[in-house]
Amino acid sequence: MNNNDRLIRLRYALDIKENDMIEMFKLGGIQVTKEEVKKMLVNPDKFEEDEEVDPDSYIIVDNTVLISFLNGLITFKRGKKDSGKNEPPKVEEPLKNSLSINNEMLKKVKIALSLTSDDLLDIFYDVDVDISKSELSALLRKEGHRNYKVCLDRYARNFLKGLALHFRD
């Protein structure tokens, strides 16, 4: 699963409109146009091998762009942090391990939607994924912690599918 796919699935699950996505990117520290958002919502992996594809018809979303969007989602859903300073949002450093993007997505969506660990367990349960509290805790830990566990695409896909079931009813 690539970042374009994650963005597409998250947008569907939370029923986010394009204008709201532009605002979320802005809150996350990245300026994008409506056309750029549309190009980000194209998954380049879905094209057939023999199909001629114009490289200008899509934009590959990297980890930094996805993390900025998720930070903007948090700010959009929960409001700005009261730090007393009026600073522009800073773009986070890229992840050391590209596999941990699923962990970051899980953590940031949990924060944005004010979900508890029990809510996450319910979401996974609704899509028939058996995950214990300790496994979930390991997925939510900081990379480098001794009990940290990489969130595989299977968990990320099912989490986004469960979110869609919860929020699109």
Regions of interest found by a model, annotated:
Residues 91, 103-109, 117, 141-148:
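Flavin-dependent oxidoreductase catalytic cores
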Residues 1-8, 16-62, 122-123, 129-156:
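A cross-kingdom feature marking solvent-exposed beta-strand/loop segments within repeated
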Residues 94-95, 99, 103, 124-125, ...:
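Positively charged, low-complexity terminal tracts
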Residues 100-103, 111-115, 130, 149-154:
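Short, well-ordered coil↔helix boundary/capping segments
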Residues 1-14, 100-112:
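Short, amphipathic alpha-helical "recognition" segments used to contact nucleic acids or chromatin
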Residues 12-25, 68-77, 117-123, 158-167:
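Extracellular/lumenal glycan-associated surfaces
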Residues 62-102, 163, 169:
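Intrinsic disorder/low-complexity detector
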Residues 63-67, 103, 118, 153, ...:
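Non-catalytic, well-ordered alpha-helical scaffold segments
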